[in-house]
A protein has these predicted regions:
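Generic C-terminus detector
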Residues: 365-369, 373-421
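Short acidic-hydrophobic, aromatic-tinged amphipathic segments that line or gate anion-handling sites
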Residues: 43-49, 121-125, 156
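ATP-binding N-terminal substructure of ATP-dependent carboxylate-amine bond-forming enzymes
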Residues: 1-94
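Short, charged, surface-exposed secondary-structure boundary motifs
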Residues: 38-41, 56, 98-104, 215-216
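Active-site "cap" helix and flanking loop/linker of ATP-utilizing ligase/carboxylase catalytic domains
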Residues: 244-266, 283-356, 368-370
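Internal nucleotide-binding/catalytic subdomain
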Residues: 152-291
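A conserved helix-loop-beta module that forms one wall/lid of the active-site cleft
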Residues: 90-151
């Protein structure tokens, strides 16, 4: 079977790696992929906004299945387009992808189906938003409505910070902004919860604790994710049941009533307040770096799981996991998430010795004249499975240090709440 993967990040390399070990998979194509996927798949350069070009490449290479990694093609409707052209594709429809594409869409769904979430207001212009925050209680949360690569969220402590956030959003920092949300600040701990669904059956696909802030101790600016560990230390049987019954099941039901089945991975961003879950956000794909953290724990055949979803037979498939802890640290280009240099040579990659249960997934990398260069903010993901998180983190940091790359930096405290406290 020939499989195509859309995307170029660490998530896509992790998916590529998981599919590459399956005997039934004869060839993998990545659109466009990175230096890591190039070792186990055929990378094909493509404009992901040109669906006709993508269709031509899929048909001409006789690809049997497409797996969509990132959110933008999903929100833009790539699944609907490929299905209309009789191409088997794994991922949610354009309408279902509005769960991530529009925070307002999701908030309205929460209201209709009584899904617990923070209280909120929707604002269409600067004046109304500023007028509201001047009378509001702090802290509060301000969010850009559309896609923002995980960075369009501000936690504001005063009027000055709120006004700056409002101005940046309406000035187009995260693309054209027609609306923004202002939410109450929930005091609790964040957790990432994953499921896979074919629109009828829902199955759990792991939990993780992401580290969004760029600096140690969860300080500094928001990023796409500096590292993660799995499982989350917050999860327990009672909380698990609440998440499924109060949040996920009503969401899938609501989409069905709108006329679209949710088929694909769903990433549920939660705030846990005294063991009660509140929805912060939905992402309509696996997280990054959570995907890199969770997939190495998967014991079952990923291709079989994906195909069962495409064929609405997920209820017939059992998903099994290795009973181990997993921890991921992201190596970033210096300067990230602000300006950083591109096309920086990464030496010593071949000198890294990865033992069993250790992985290095590429993200913002490219091959130029047979050498690997950093071209993105998040560059490499180092992952380790172990019986405990401290051992996993120690081995990951040893691997990063053996690389000795002067152009990068990373957080040394990933997992600190489960290891150091």
């Amino acid at each position: 079977m020939k499989v195509g993967i859309i995307g170029s990040g660490g998530r896509e390399h992790a998916i590529c790696h998981a599919l590459n070990i399956i005997k039934k998979v004869k060839q993998i194509y990545c659109f466009p992929g990175n230096a890591g996927t190039a070792r186990i798949a055929k990378n094909i350069s493509v404009n992901l906004e040109n669906f006709n070009e993508l269709k031509y490449l899929i048909i001409s290479n006789k690809i049997d299945l497409i797996v969509v990694g990132p959110e933008k093609p999903l929100v833009d409707g790539v699944v609907d387009f490929l299905e209309a052209n009789k191409i088997k594709v794994f991922g949610p429809s354009k309408l279902a992808s509005q769960l991530e594409g529009s925070k307002i869409f999701t908030k309205n769904l929460c209201e209709k189906y009584n899904i617990p979430t923070a209280k909120f207001g929707i604002f269409e212009n600067i004046d109304d938003a500023v007028q509201f925050v001047c009378k509001a209680k702090y802290p509060l949360v301000i969010k850009a409505d559309g896609l923002a690569s995980g960075k369009g969220v501000y936690i504001c402590e005063n009027d000055f910070e709120s006004k700056l956030a409002i101005k940046e959003i309406f000035d187009g920092k995260f693309g054209v902004a027609k609306n923004l949300l202002i939410e109450e600040f929930l005091r609790g701990e964040e957790m990432s919860y994953f499921i896979i669904s074919d629109g009828k059956t829902i199955k759990k696909f792991g939990t993780a604790q992401d580290h969004k802030r760029v600096l140690e101790g969860d300080k500094g600016k928001n990023t796409g994710g500096m590292g993660a560990y799995s499982p989350s230390r917050l999860i327990n049987e009672e909380l698990d049941k609440k998440i499924m019954s109060r949040i996920i099941e009503p969401t899938i039901k609501g989409l069905n009533e709108m006329g679209t089945k949710y088929r694909g991975f769903l990433y549920v961003g939660l705030m846990i307040v005294e063991n009660d879950p509140y929805l912060i956000e939905y992402n309509v794909r696996m997280g990054d770096p959570e995907c890199q953290t969770i997939l190495p724990k998967l014991k079952s055949d990923l291709l079989e799981i994906i195909l069962s979803c495409c064929n609405e037979k997920l209820n017939e498939t059992e998903i099994k996991w290795h009973n181990k802890k997993s921890l991921c640290v992201v190596l970033c280009s210096k300067g990230y998430p602000d300006k950083f240099k591109k096309n920086i040579l990464i030496q010593n990659l071949n000198k890294i010795k990865l033992n069993q249960n250790e992985y290095c997934y590429h993200a913002g990398t490219n091959i130029i004249k047979e050498e690997v260069y950093a071209i993105g903010g998040r560059v490499l993901n180092f992952v380790c499975l172990s019986q405990n998180f401290l051992d996993a983190r120690t081995k990951v940091i040893n691997s990063i240090n053996s690389l000795n790359w002067s152009g990068g930096f990373y957080r040394k405290d990933i997992g600190y709440k489960v290891i150091d406290e």
